[in-house]
């Protein structure tokens, strides 16, 4: 069965909207996920939460921690654990670059988006980020509010 010509290349499953507010995003990259069958079926049903998750290095491997993919409703005894550690697939060069940034410069790796690419593979968009201080968050919020107010004024008067 052919896909429609105007179908989007990426089917969004989950987005971490708080990451851009809580962190200063410095760099992004795409990583694959090692998933079980029932996890993929839950993702196809658009059921996932990556808002409180993060990526970490353990034993030379890259892991996604605290992501939530609920159990598949039609799955029986072969269902998965909803909050299990999930291995991330990243090239060695990217992994070493991220590891050096995280260990030396005090940065963190947070997920931004979870989606299926055009080949139907589950991918995770990761960001190398630095945590914002409280005053930076307030400043960001003030800028956003001012831009909304400017747009409203221009629209009403313009």
Swiss-Prot record:
MF terms in GO: RNA binding
Assigned GO CC terms: cytosol
Biased composition (Basic and acidic residues): 136-158
Disordered as annotated region, ranges: 131-158
Disulphide bridges, residue numbers: none
Cross-referenced InterPro entries: SmpB, SsrA-bd_prot, SsrA-bd_prot_CS
Main location: cytoplasm
Localization (cell): Cytoplasm
Key words of the record: Cytoplasm, RNA-binding
Gene Ontology BP annotations: trans-translation
SUPFAM superfamilies for this protein: Small protein B (SmpB) (SSF74982)
Family: Belongs to the SmpB family.
HAMAP family, per the entry: SmpB (MF_00023)
NCBIfam families, alphabetized: PRK05422.1, smpB
Purpose of the protein: Required for rescue of stalled ribosomes mediated by trans-translation. Binds to transfer-messenger RNA (tmRNA), required for stable association of tmRNA with ribosomes. tmRNA and SmpB together mimic tRNA shape, replacing the anticodon stem-loop with SmpB. tmRNA is encoded by the ssrA gene; the 2 termini fold to resemble tRNA(Ala) and it encodes a 'tag peptide', a short internal open reading frame. During trans-translation Ala-aminoacylated tmRNA acts like a tRNA, entering the A-site of stalled ribosomes, displacing the stalled mRNA.
PANTHER family: SSRA-BINDING PROTEIN, TMRNA-BINDING COMPONENT OF TRANS-TRANSLATION TAGGING COMPLEX
Name of the protein: SsrA-binding protein
Species assigned in the record: Brucella canis (strain ATCC 23365 / NCTC 10854 / RM-666)
Gene: smpB
């Amino acid at each position: 069965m052919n896909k429609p010509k105007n179908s989007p290349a990426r089917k969004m499953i989950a987005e971490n909207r708080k990451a851009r507010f809580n962190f200063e995003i410095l760099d992004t990259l795409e990583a694959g996920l090692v998933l079980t069958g029932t996890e993929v079926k839950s993702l196809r049903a658009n059921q996932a939460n990556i808002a409180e998750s993060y990526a970490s290095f353990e034993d030379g491997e890259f892991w996604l921690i605290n992501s939530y993919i609920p159990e598949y409703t039609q799955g029986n005894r072969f269902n998965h654990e909803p909050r299990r550690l999930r291995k991330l697939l990243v090239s060695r060069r990217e992994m070493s670059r991220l590891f050096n940034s995280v260990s030396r410069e005090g940065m963190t790796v947070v997920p931004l988006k979870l989606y299926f690419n055009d080949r139907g593979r589950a991918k995770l968009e990761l960001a190398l980020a630095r945590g914002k201080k409280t005053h930076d968050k307030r400043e960001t919020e003030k800028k956003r509010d001012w831009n909304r107010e400017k747009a409203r004024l221009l629209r009403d008067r313009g």
